[in-house]
């Protein structure tokens, strides 16, 4: 190791005459984290609307407790994932001393995303999306 702030050099297949071309892995990781955060915001908004729909139906709706619990757990996981992605974006991947910590954070975020996907599959299976259409059809307000 040359120094504590050593940067990683990668060789492109189609590199120019200079041979090695410097790639800023930190910039790549930051862009990836921002893109994941945008997807997380979209899912968060969708789950918030599902929660609103289920709550409007009331506690006598089918699977009410199950859906409310799953949606709240999903929302909480999404907040934790967002915080992890912010920390991943803040830390510099090019600094060797951060790489091990960033790898652990990235693994944790990936596991939490997988769990969130599974929870959202169950939310869809229990019919939270039907709750909105049922509430709209049974509403006494004219369209």
From Swiss-Prot:
A Pfam family assignment: Ninjurin
Q: Where is the signal peptide?
A: none
Membrane side Cytoplasmic: which residues?
A: 94-97
Membrane topology, from the record: Multi-pass membrane protein
Instruction: List the GO cellular component terms.
Output: plasma membrane
Entry keywords, A to Z:
Cell adhesion, Cell membrane, Membrane, Transmembrane, Transmembrane helix
The answer to keyword Membrane applying to this record is yes
Q: Which residues lie on this side of the membrane: Extracellular?
A: 1-61, 128-143
Region (Helix alpha2) location: 39-58
Query: Where does the sequence pass through the membrane?
Result: 62-93, 98-127
Residues noted as binding cholesterol in the record, renumbered to the chain = 104
The recorded induction information for this protein reads: By nerve injury; in Schwann cells.
Q: Where is this region: Helix alpha1?
A: 26-38
Nucleotidyltransferase: is it a keyword of this entry? no
Identify the main location. Answer: membrane
Q: Where in the cell does this protein reside? A: Cell membrane
InterPro entries (UniProt xref): Ninjurin
A GO biological process of this protein is: tissue regeneration
Q: Which family does it belong to?
A: Belongs to the ninjurin family.
Any notes on this protein's domains?
A: Composed of 4 alpha helices: 2 hydrophobic transmembrane regions (alpha3 and alpha4) and 2 alpha helices (alpha1 and alpha2). Alpha1 and alpha2 feature one hydrophobic side and a hydrophilic side. In contrast to NINJ1, does not disrupt membrane integrity. NINJ2 filaments are curved toward the intracellular space due to cholesterol-binding, preventing circularization and ability to mediate plasma membrane rupture.
What function does the entry list? Answer: Its role in unclear. In contrast to NINJ1 paralog, does not mediate plasma membrane rupture (cytolysis) downstream of necroptotic and pyroptotic programmed cell death. While it is able to oligomerize and form filaments, filaments are curved toward the intracellular space, preventing circularization to mediate plasma membrane rupture. May act as a homophilic transmembrane adhesion molecule involved in nerve regeneration. Promotes axonal growth.
Q: What is this protein called?
A: Ninjurin-2
